[in-house]
Every structure is written in C-alpha cells, then in structure tokens.
C-alpha cells in the first residue's frame, strides 16, 4: 500500500485521536496534542459525513470541554484549523476557542 504524505498525515491524526479517546475513557485528562488530535479527527470526519463548514465551525467548540483537558490546555488552544475533505472538495475549517 502506497500512501501520499497527506494521507499519512490523516492516518496519524486517526491513530492519535484513538489513543487520546482511550486515555479519556480511562478517566485521564487530555494534554495539548491529545486534545488537538480529537478535535481535528472529529472535524475531518464531520466533513467526510457531509456536514457544512459553518456547522463544523460551531460544532467544533462542543467536542471537548475544560473538564476534559489538563489545567491550562484550553488556554493554550485559541484556534484549530483543519483542511478537511468535503464531498465537493477540500476546505479550511477554523474553530475559535474550541475548548470551553
């Protein structure tokens, strides 16, 4: 199997998000990379499912809460930008203050 660099990056996000979700299910609070991985993964999958950019931008701030992450992580992430593949092409999804 030969994957392009962009596909490898997407696969890495999936693996990182899966690991982060497993840790979260064990009751651990997420660190910065884990929180980014989960938010990124959910936005990419939402785009793949056909949700609109506007919908993802508002929904993206509900994926994780301050209670889900370690102290200070929410303050470190002021914005998440994901280049996601939609049914009609690739678009940039920006979520401001994604952890509330």
Swiss-Prot record:
It is an enzyme of class 3 (hydrolase). It holds the Pfam family Urease_gamma. It comes from the Bacteria. Pathway: Nitrogen metabolism; urea degradation; CO(2) and NH(3) from urea (urease route): step 1/1. GO terms for cellular component: cytoplasm. It catalyses: urea + 2 H2O + H(+) = hydrogencarbonate + 2 NH4(+). InterPro entries: Urease_gamma (IPR012010), Urease_gamma/gamma-beta_su (IPR002026), Urease_gamma_sf (IPR036463), Urease_subunit (IPR050069). One of its GO terms (molecular function) is nickel cation binding. Its main location: cytoplasm. SUPFAM superfamilies: Urease, gamma-subunit (SSF54111). HAMAP family: Urease_gamma. Belongs to the urease gamma subunit family. This is Urease subunit gamma. It comes from Micrococcus luteus (strain ATCC 4698 / DSM 20030 / JCM 1464 / CCM 169 / CCUG 5858 / IAM 1056 / NBRC 3333 / NCIMB 9278 / NCTC 2665 / VKM Ac-2230). The lineage of its organism: Bacteria, Bacillati, Actinomycetota, Actinomycetes, Micrococcales.
């Amino acid at each position: 199997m030969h994957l392009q660099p962009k596909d490898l990056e997407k696969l890495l996000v999936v693996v990182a998000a899966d690991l982060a979700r497993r840790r979260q299910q064990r009751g651990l609070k997420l660190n910065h990379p884990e929180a980014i991985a989960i938010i990124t993964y959910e936005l990419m999958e939402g785009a793949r499912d056909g949700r609109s950019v506007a919908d993802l931008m508002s929904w993206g701030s509900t994926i994780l809460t301050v209670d889900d992450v370690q102290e200070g992580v929410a303050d470190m992430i002021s914005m998440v930008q994901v280049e996601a593949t939609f049914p009609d092409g690739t678009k940039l999804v920006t979520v401001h203050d994604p952890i509330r």
